[in-house]
C-alpha cells in the first residue's frame, strides 16, 4: 500500500509542484510511507487500486476524478484535496488584481475553473493546505482540514547549510539594518 499523490499542476507552475507535491512526497517518505506521484494527465484509475490514501493537488473536477472519489469512498480509501490558494470559490475572484483586466468571457472562463476546483474539493473527504488562514477558510467547505506547510527539500537544506554563518563570535560592534 502507498499514498498516491496526483499533481494537477503538472509542473506548469514549478514552485507549486515542488512545494505541494514533490516536497510532500519526500516528507512522507522520511516518515516511512511509500508514495507514488503522478501527473493528472497520466493518471489512470488502476493507479489508485493499492493506494491507502489519495491526495489530489490543485486538480479541477473531471469525470475520472469524480469516479475515483466514488470508488475510493466505496473501498474506504480517504481522498484529500490539497490546495494552497483561494481558488475554490468565486466569492474571491472579483477581488484579484489579475481578474480586473479580464473581459467578461475570460472572467467567465476563470470563474468556471475556480468552480471546478470547488467541486473537486466538495467530492473529497478532507482538505490539506499550507496556511492557517486557508485552513480556516476551508473549514467552511470541509470538516477535516489538515495543515501542512510548505517545506524546504533535503537538497535545499543541504545547499543552504553550506552557507550558514557562525554567529558564536561575540563583538562590541552594533549593526543596524533597514529593511
Q: What residue ranges belong to the model's regions?
A:
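Structural motif
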Residues: 53-57, 80-82, 128, 177
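An aromatic- and histidine-rich active-site surface loop
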Residues: 58-74, 82-94
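Donor nucleotide-sugar binding/catalytic pocket of nucleotide-sugar-dependent glycosyltransferases
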Residues: 122-166, 175
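Acceptor-binding helix/loop patch of EC 2.4 sugar-transfer enzymes
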Residues: 81-114, 155-160, 169-172
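Conserved donor-binding/catalytic core segment of Leloir-type glycosyltransferases
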Residues: 4-5, 167-179
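Short catalytic/ligand-binding loop motif for oxyanion handling, primarily in non-cytosolic enzymes
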Residues: 13, 45-47, 62-65, 87-91, ...
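N-terminal pre-catalytic "stem/leader" segment of glycosyltransferase-like enzymes
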Residues: 1-56, 60
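Membrane-proximal helix-turn-helix segments that form the acceptor-binding/catalytic region
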Residues: 49, 70-74, 104-126
Amino acid at each position: 500500500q502507498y499514498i498516491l499523490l496526483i499533481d494537477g499542476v503538472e509542473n506548469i507552475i514549478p514552485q507549486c509542484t515542488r512545494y505541494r507535491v514533490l516536497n510532500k512526497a519526500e516528507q512522507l517518505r522520511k516518515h516511512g510511507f511509500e508514495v507514488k506521484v503522478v501527473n493528472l494527465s497520466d493518471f489512470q484509475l488502476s493507479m489508485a487500486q493499492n493506494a491507502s490514501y489519495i491526495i489530489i493537488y490543485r486538480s479541477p473536477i473531471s469525470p475520472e476524478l469524480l469516479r475515483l472519489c466514488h470508488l475510493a469512498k466505496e473501498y474506504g480509501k480517504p481522498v484529500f484535496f490539497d490546495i494552497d490558494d483561494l481558488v475554490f470559490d468565486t466569492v474571491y475572484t472579483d477581488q484579484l488584481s489579475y481578474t480586473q483586466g479580464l473581459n467578461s468571457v475570460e472572467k467567465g472562463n476563470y470563474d468556471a475553473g475556480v468552480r471546478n476546483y470547488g467541486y473537486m474539493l466538495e467530492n473529497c473527504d478532507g482538505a490539506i493546505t499550507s496556511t492557517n488562514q486557508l485552513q480556516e477558510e476551508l473549514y467552511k467547505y470541509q470538516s477535516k482540514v489538515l495543515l501542512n506547510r510548505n517545506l524546504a527539500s533535503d537538497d535545499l537544506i543541504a545547499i543552504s547549510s553550506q552557507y550558514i554563518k557562525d554567529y558564536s563570535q561575540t563583538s562590541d560592534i552594533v549593526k543596524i539594518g533597514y529593511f
